[in-house]
Design a protein with these regions (language model features):
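Outer-membrane beta-barrel proteins and related beta-barrel translocases across Gram-negative bacteria
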Residues: 1-166
């Protein structure tokens, strides 16, 4: 992680080996290593103030993997997130209420599986009730998720459709 300045940071985590035999040459049993998917990820984050009683943060990154395959036990590599964006905003003590907004958008990619995009949106409001003998914090929110699938098989029910969940 590297501080860029004024609330911005950049990060890079890139792992790669020369070939699928890399770990087998170190040990005869690939299961003896815990690394089968090497993360390759980089992105930026921002953390800042949202007025006197608030904060806001953004994250954007891309992530893929180098999958080390054992020819005797092949498996499907994980989905890549190309890209992923998220945002969180909190504003506290506005008329004795706290407001929060969380959201993210991710493009999932896989060379052989169904691709898709996911949108998550979660606005919520809470009313902190505190005194010297205890507290209770009622909270109301709406959690919305939308999936848009690509490359689905012809017989799939949701090919080219959006799948919503609230």
């Amino acid at each position: 992680t590297q501080n860029i300045g004024k609330g911005w940071q950049g990060f890079l985590n890139y792992n790669q080996v020369s070939d699928d035999r890399y770990f087998r040459e170190l040990t005869p049993n690939l299961a003896q290593t815990s690394l089968t998917n090497l993360s390759q990820q980089g992105g930026v984050t921002y953390n800042g103030r949202l007025g006197a009683n608030g904060t806001i943060s953004f994250t954007g990154f891309a992530q893929r993997f180098q999958t080390i395959q054992d020819p005797l036990a092949l498996f499907v590599s994980p989905y890549e997130r190309l890209p992923h964006f998220s945002m969180n905003a909190i504003k506290r003590n506005v008329g004795k209420m706290d407001f929060e907004l969380n959201g993210s958008w991710t493009n999932f990619y896989h060379p052989t599986e169904v691709d898709g995009k996911r949108l998550v949106f979660y606005p919520n409001v809470s009313v902190p009730l505190r005194n010297e003998y205890g507290f209770i914090i009622p909270k109301f929110g709406l959690h919305y998720t939308n999936y848009s699938l690509d490359k689905a098989p012809v017989e799939a029910t949701h090919k080219g459709e959006n799948i919503d969940r609230t």
